Swiss-Prot record:
Catalysed reaction equations from the record: L-glutamyl-tRNA(Gln) + L-glutamine + ATP + H2O = L-glutaminyl-tRNA(Gln) + L-glutamate + ADP + phosphate + H(+)
Encoding gene (name): gatA
Subunit structure: Subunit of the heterotrimeric GatCAB amidotransferase (AdT) complex, composed of A, B and C subunits.
Broad class of the protein's primary localization: mitochondrion
Protein name (Swiss-Prot/TrEMBL): Glutamyl-tRNA(Gln) amidotransferase subunit A, mitochondrial
Source organism phylogeny: Eukaryota, Metazoa, Ecdysozoa, Arthropoda, Chelicerata
């Protein structure tokens, strides 16, 4: 049952082949059995069971709320939920219980979805491996590399827990967040669909901010159809989020054809994304899929996004500057971790932030404060804003030329062993993990990561489709056609259930 898609599960509810209560219990058991992967920070069995019983009553009376009623969902631990611990994977918020619920979570619950718990993540979303959480790293379910303590594969990040929850069947969908690729990256690593909607299509209210101008709620799902259902359920204008907009009906009421046609669809392949560090397997996949799209009737051509080559540096400056501003609130006084050293206000600030925030977070705060110094403001922050505009303009020009979608890699390699990952510094990780994903966030565009094939080592490889703003319908239609063409193998849940050697790592 855990291998069913959302649409298949709802069909089972309609036919009374199973009930939301049964499915909820099965998911909770799977979460507990898979605890060695460390996908969840907080599990909510009692609350989930209550929601499942209420859903069962609605199905029994013939009055389900919609296509998500009774469907188990996981939520990344940077979305607020009333009275539910929300940590952002950080010691700073280890005991933070929000007084309100994020709008996207409210909308899912309003559709009858059953929230199972909160998923693990890189601390405050600042990472690409899901290895930097205060609650320990999340492990990739696709392959156990060996018996050494650090010889396992990373999930990608920062929404690694959500990706693992979906890949293992612990949940039928999940919320992530995407600031520079944090939904698409782990989706790619874990063999699930990862959707980054257009900036503003989903409310950010209740999403604890990292970089306000780029953060968006993301969606992780088993298939493109499921991602479309979750998108339609969550897209809305929200008076609590001034950056949200009323998305077109094609986004809010998205319906995909059974077998979408690609005939005549113009797809661009950005030449700048063929960059140093790309492994041959990803390059071969990219070329092969472009050829297969052409065989399906698409018009595939090379395009240029010349300023994307500066995206890593540009993103780094802007991200650090916004982090420095946003994280001034974590001072140990109003909420969050409070150190015992209260000899002075300055000492309390310093000790609370040192104890509560990891080295990566503290490093970005320091860098952001440096970039924002009066002597450096024009040289770094203003210049980065100008480059961001150039990156965005490149996309605008390509789409104005008649190109409808772009096809790019998501990451430059398959998932790395943790032992390899730890050898790279944070800057090197970003250049490999986020080069192909960050430009989309800076332009505010929609993108979707689609699993394509397994590497020679048996790890998922994915590609990304990118479209103009609010083109989710056309983009997901192409993604679904690609999904049907490639028939990516899902994780063998029975085999996964017996990978107990992970538990000793």
């Amino acid at each position: 049952m855990l291998s069913l898609t959302i649409k298949e599960l709802v069909s089972h509810f309609k036919a009374k082949k199973c009930s939301p209560v049964d499915i909820c219990a099965t998911c909770i058991k799977e979460i507990n059995d898979s605890s060695f992967l460390n996908a969840f920070v907080t599990v909510l069995p009692e609350a989930a069971e209550k929601q499942a019983r209420e859903s069962h009553a609605r199905w029994k009376s013939g009055k389900p709320r919609g296509p998500l009623d009774g469907v188990p969902i996981a939520v990344k631990d940077n979305f607020c939920m009333t009275g539910v611990r929300t940590t952002c994977g950080s010691r700073m918020l280890a005991n933070f219980y929000p007084p309100y619920t994020a709008t996207v979570v409210e909308r899912l619950q309003g559709e009858g979805a059953v929230v199972l718990g909160k998923t693990n993540m890189d601390e405050f979303g600042m990472g690409s491996g899901a290895t930097d959480s205060a609650f320990g790293p999340t492990k990739n379910p696709w392959k156990n590399a060996g018996e050494a303590a650090d010889d396992w594969y990373i999930t990608g990040g920062s929404s690694g827990g959500s990706a693992v929850a979906v890949a293992t069947g612990c949940s039928f969908g999940a919320l992530g967040s995407d600031t520079g690729g944090s939904t698409r990256n782990p989706a790619s690593r874990c063999g699930v669909v990862g959707l980054k909607p257009t900036y503003g299509a989903l409310s950010r209210h209740g999403l604890i901010p990292l970089t306000n101008s780029m953060d968006v709620p993301g969606i992780l799902a088993k298939c493109v159809d499921d991602a479309a259902v979750l998108l339609s359920a969550t897209a809305c204008a929200d008076p609590n989020d001034s950056t949200s907009v009323s998305a077109p009906d094609s986004v809010r009421h998205l319906k995909l054809a059974g077998e979408p046609s690609l005939k005549g669809v113009k797809i661009g392949v950005p030449k700048e994304y063929h960059c140093p560090g790309m492994c041959p397997e990803v390059l071969d996949l990219w070329r092969d899929v472009a050829d297969r799209l052409a065989a399906l009737g698409a018009v595939v051509s090379s395009v240029s996004l010349p300023h994307s080559r500066y995206s890593t540096e540009c993103y780094s400056v802007l991200n650090c500057c916004e982090v420095a501003s946003n994280f001034a609130r974590y001072d140990g006084l109003e909420y969050g971790h409070r150190a015992s050293d209260d000899s002075s206000t300055d000492a309390l600030y310093a000790a609370s932030r040192h104890e509560g925030l990891n080295e990566v977070v503290r490093g970005r705060i320091l860098a952001g404060n440096y970039f924002l110094l009066r002597a450096n403001y024009e040289k770094y922050f203003t210049k980065a804003l100008q480059v961001r505009r150039l990156i965005s303009d490149d996309f605008t020009k390509v789409f104005a030329s008649g190109v409808e979608l772009l096809l790019t890699p998501v990451t430059l390699t398959a998932a790395l062993r943790h032992s390899e990952w730890t050898l790279k510094d944070n800057r090197e990780r970003a250049s490999v993990e986020d080069f192909c994903t960050q430009p989309v966030n800076m332009a505010g565009l929609p993108a979707v990561s689609v699993p394509c094939r397994l590497s020679r080592e048996g790890l998922p490889l994915s590609l990304q489709l990118v479209g103009p703003k609010f083109s989710e319908a056309a983009m997901l239609a192409a993604a679904k056609r690609l999904e049907l063409e490639l028939s990516f193998p899902r994780l063998d849940l029975q085999l996964h259930a017996h990978q107990e050697s992970y538990a000793t790592l």
